């Protein structure tokens, strides 16, 4: 409704006007920019577009699914039907952030395998079969975060991650290796 109102009143595409949505989680914009969406590759390129898909298949060295994935709401519906039996939750806490937390906790608890990668032992992590302790982006990791206004901010480590905590990219890289997939470099510049 707000988007429609902004369009109707001419407040889109003009300097100093428009909407800046408040997102529910940190770095949602940056995640979308990098392709962490069920229907988009990096740069918001459509998964269902054969030309886009072929370009990323060449870069990734793998055949990619030509169909859109499902978003969180549909994932919980699929859990309820028994169609989704495992989940890897990275930097989210759906056991506390979903609208119906009791229902979310029941569904997460019923999975055959729940893996959580997070900086805290969240309620979701408490339900997990496997927990990967991650480092904090703002103080312990090298990379970028993007605000809702699309301002990209560089982050550099100021301290070493505590205990067994590791950078997200290092955890994902090792998981790939253990599954026989070379995810390439772990350098954030790539």
Across the structure, where does each feature detected by a protein language model lie?
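Non-catalytic alpha/beta scaffold blocks inside enzyme catalytic domains
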Residues: 1-15, 20-189
